[in-house]
From Swiss-Prot:
Modified residues (S-(dipyrrolylmethanemethyl)cysteine): C241
Keyword Isomerase on entry: no
Enzyme class name: transferase
Cofactor(s) demanded: dipyrromethane
Molecular function GO labels: hydroxymethylbilane synthase activity
SUPFAM superfamilies, alphabetized: Periplasmic binding protein-like II (SSF53850), Porphobilinogen deaminase (hydroxymethylbilane synthase), C-terminal domain (SSF54782)
Keywords noted in UniProt: Porphyrin biosynthesis, Transferase
Protein name in the entry: Porphobilinogen deaminase
HAMAP family: Porphobil_deam (MF_00260)
Amino acid sequence: MRREVVVGTRGSRLALAQADWVIDHLRARYPRVSFVRKEIRTTGDNILEVALAKIGDKGLFTKELEQALLHREIDLAVHSMKDLPTGLPEGLVIGAVSVREYPGDVFISRGGERLEELPAGAVLGTSSLRRTAQLLAYRPDLQVIPVRGNVQTRLRKLDEGVVDALVLAWAGLFRLGLTERVTHRIPVAMCLPAVGQGALGIEARADDAEILEMLRTIDHAPTRAAVQAERTLLRRLEGGCQVPVGALGRFRDGRLVLEAVVASLDGTELVRAQESGPADRPEALGNSLAVRLLEMGAGEILARVRAGA
């Protein structure tokens, strides 16, 4: 058993909180091992004035961490699962998927208004095309603008009046102890979350048996299955992190139910469907629902989104 394990993470407060969650849980199981946190800046951290969709989405928040893994500078990398591309570099695997926090989005307004109470023309801030598309389908009279930066930066822009309201993931606010800022949760029936939202993905080298054995102790099998179905669907749709695709896998009566949506950027076109399948066949379920969405016109919607990006 090695004496030291180097844990790679981005440097934001949220990323550090997530890395500390992993370290705390591993340390409880391996008290004789020293877990050292190493902060690594990513492309997405360095480019803050450009909308994510215009930069491209191939590992914006993960590539540098993966390179550090491959160069053996770190032993594992902690990611927000929603940031992890569906295709991993050769030699790397997802060693663990954490138990999932509430996966949905939340609405935060400066004046305490709910989403349905915002006046026409109000400015809503989000960096996500997925959120933009689904929320415009519900409230086409709102003005949606991109808001980049960490959670604290976005909240500051709200407080300063740059926007009237924000949409953020519940999980990030929860991990930062900021849930008192939430006006209300947005029902997933209105806005499906990003693939993997609410879960952490811990990446490791495929040939590092010792680290993979450690990570098995914090792997949450139900979350892994749900996320695997979601990621398979996204891969089959040839989507990425910066496309208007939402998906959520949940367990009902012992079966895995997968629901997904594909929408145009302005919310005027939207296809949504769900299917269920055996819990031990998440990839088959993801592929099946993706094919159904493509038959409903999802491919044409995504092609138009990519052409306009």
